[in-house]
Amino acid sequence: MKNLRLFALLAFLLLAGKNTMAQTDLEALMATRGEYFFSLPLQQREEAKRLTRLCSVDKLEGNRLICYANEEQYRQLLAMGYQPMLLMPPSMQEHYAMWDGTNREAYDWDAYPTYEAYQDMMKHYAEDFPERCTYFDLGTLASGRKLMFCRFNNGDPDGKPKFLYTSTIHGDELTGMMLMLRLIDELCTSNDPRILALLDQLDIFISPCTNPNGTYHGGNNTVYGARRNNANDADLNRNYPDFDNGPHPDGKEYQPETIMMMELAEQYPFTMAANYHGGSEVLNYPWDTYQPLHPDDEWWQLVCHEYADLTHEHDTMYMSGFDNGIVNGYVWYPIYGSRQDYMNYYQQCREVTIECSIPYTPNPSTMPMYWTYNHESMLRYLEQCLYGIHGRVTDSVTGAPLEAEVTILTHDHHGSAVSSHLPAGDYHRPIKGGTYEVTYSCEGYYPKTLTLTVADWETLVQDVQLVPEGYGVEEGGPSAPLTGLVIYLNPTNGVLFVEAQNFASLQNQTYRITNLMGQTLLTGNITAETQQINVSSLPQGMYFITIAGETRKFVVR
């Protein structure tokens, strides 16, 4: 396997050399494509920040940037005095074996599917395995091509974490597309208990190609000539709202593909996601746009190292750069408008960018090798969606599920808090092992804060009931005085305080706490001007306290 990888890299380098052309010829070629691929020397890191606003910086290699630009961007760079070194487009360095969809049983994942074969595969999986898989698309582009998905669960997705795997937002980065198709095949056909457990416990969405116009730019029967950008010359991974650089950081309107994906994220509250790219071998975790660390930076390093470390069991040189296969996006090079940052900040979804091959458009004969490298890591990343703190939030009176905010105190910010969602009221919070103060809050309900401890690779189920505001409390609020008697905190989660304006009249009086059935649960005497009564032994619910003939209602939460 290592020899095969070495062969693939050598072939990539040789083909790049073989296809070297004069700069004038390359410029003419790229003008016909409307997309330029080039390198720029980098003198200072600050220059990368400036250039990422002028073109699509794809990666930083030593002291040079590898970039893409559309016609307008390229002319602007030239006008500003930059001298790009044009490079052969990745998808034009060789001709690629294509599969037209015939003889599916003999297909060995070593040729790229034509568009029609890709579409047929997606639909046939759902038709052949309806108990596991459903097919849907997000809509039809002007070209007639679709953004297609397969969705996997056991037929009962409510209350389960939702997971999103996608690839090829850049049309010429095809390794991830093939990994996604093969994972779809495994989820449909395998009866391994591990796969069945994933189908039972998760609601999984997979889209192998989210930029089909870029991938099949040269026509539906080939990926030769595939482009990074979409049909409107837009880099889709710079086209999302950016919390630090505004709603349109690329200066373009939201593209049809972007709108479709944002609508999907609004409809389905994904817990975790990954988006596969090519051109490097590294897991790029948040943020891309922002230097301060993500609140869950330690968790991100944990799960990213797990992914990369598992690939090293097959080849220690694969995903070995940076911090042993992982990198903070901003530390590598900043970009603005990435889907990763959009999903993390705006959609409360932990999404990572996985760069899975140095060649952008590898020879498809190497695809089985990349599957071997990534297979276990892909399953482990899916399973990470099951760890952390999970549960349901419901109304303490009616039992109805609630849409509540679940916030880790002194920890969450920049969109890292999660929510519970209807119809089940379920929430899912992946987090690094530790002890946390977790607050559950919902409009119209008293908040509740719990101290929870969870370990790495552990699942903690914590269901929570919230008490409606004003439930069982007299008009005027829970601490409104009546003939000088005041009780607080109300609701309480442990200690009830009783005060009287005229302590002498209450001193040594007996208090009695009863439930809704009238049963006496606690009694005692008033012995202090501010009497503390321990009610931590009482279950959640509404109670009455009676002192000297006066009765107050209170709630234990």
Tell me the role of every PLM-derived stretch.
Residues 1-29:
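Bacterial Sec-dependent N-terminal signal peptides
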Residues 18-22, 477-557:
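C-terminal outer-membrane/trafficking sorting elements
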Residues 142, 157-305, 313, 317-320, ...:
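Active-site/substrate-binding loop(s) of hydrolase catalytic cores
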Residues 272-295, 325-383:
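Active-site-adjacent mobile loop/cap segments within catalytic or ligand-binding domains
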Residues 389-396, 464:
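A short, amphipathic beta-strand motif
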Residues 400-432:
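Short, acidic Ser/Thr/Gly-rich low-complexity loop/linker segments typical of extracellular
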Residues 433-444:
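A short, solvent-exposed beta-strand micro-motif common in secreted/extracellular proteins
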Residues 443-469, 556-557:
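Structured interaction patches on ligand/partner-binding surfaces of diverse proteins
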